[in-house]
Amino acid sequence: MSTLPLPGHFDPKNAEIFGYRPDLAQVAMDAFDFKKLHSIKAAGADAVKMAVVPIDAQEDFSHPEGTLFVAGRSGRGAIDDAVRLTEFLYRHIHLITGIYPTFDTHFALQVFSAPFWVGPAGEPLSPHTLIVADAGGVLNNVGLDGTVLIRNVKPRPEMAWWLCGANYGWLVKQMLHYVEELARGGKYTLYLWPPHTLLGTPGHAMTGVLTEARMFHSYVRGVQSHGEIKGGHPLSECYSVFGEEVRTRFDGQALASKNTRFIDVLLSHDVVVFAGQAASHCVKSSIDDFLTELVARDAALAGKIYILEDCMSSVTVPDGAGGFAADFTDDALAALDKFRDAGMHVVKSTDPLEIWPGIPAALARLAS
């Protein structure tokens, strides 16, 4: 069976609409007709199991109206990515066993949010700035150009009662440990983001065209819709779906743990396909963590991983003068090179599956 036609309900222009809500009752009816017309079997009968993992394809990242639109260098990044990924899902719905979207899920006060921090006089910090530690163990707020904006910043004291049993001294020590561990581990510098994907807000939802495709897949293939939640720990960033950026406390105890359950779910498939937002951050970090786990188990497992390079974009921060105050595209490109070198496959959504390198022969026959 070759690729399938796009279903009649799909309109790529809907990818441009923040808050697009598909009629899921009608989608379910369409799915039954589509399944019968194309003689599509249940997902449980797949001889070769394929998982597709859309990373954080949520409204806040996918639209200019969102609080953290991933525009890339083109200015339309996540919008066009959503169209291509949606078309890929529809055309290969008969081959995709499971779709496993991740959901960046945040709350008002977390370590990467500006309102979590204050200056020495209680002054607020601004988004799109950084927190760094100097040689004397003092945390400073700096601009993207490295200019020191506020010296000796600290977590807000009033948070201590619910974060750490009112032990504010513990919280201050933990934040210094956190920032220093980021540097030691070669992680991103602590970046203060605008509020985004807050649980219960419209921006947390999966972008509408992908919700439509995800549910259509569930109805056609008779498989449950999935959703992997990440990002709720108040004391650590969590770019990767497989765990927090820093998982230790300053006293040597554990702060968080690796998401081995989801790793095992994905590795139960023969082919795992990654896409989503942003290529420079959550996609990059998730695949990097996944690669570390694969190498620890069996480096040859990297050969079952495919990355849709045309279904992801990088974070860019406009400078208001036609350029970028921050552009993380080069980080994403370097990561793709690393993943290729490790044995993963970087492909395009428009490439026929049968020519994907290393694709299982049984799947290639079905796709041709």
Question: Where are the regions that the model predicts?
Answer:
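Active-site-adjacent betaalpha module
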Residues: 1-53, 57-100, 106-368
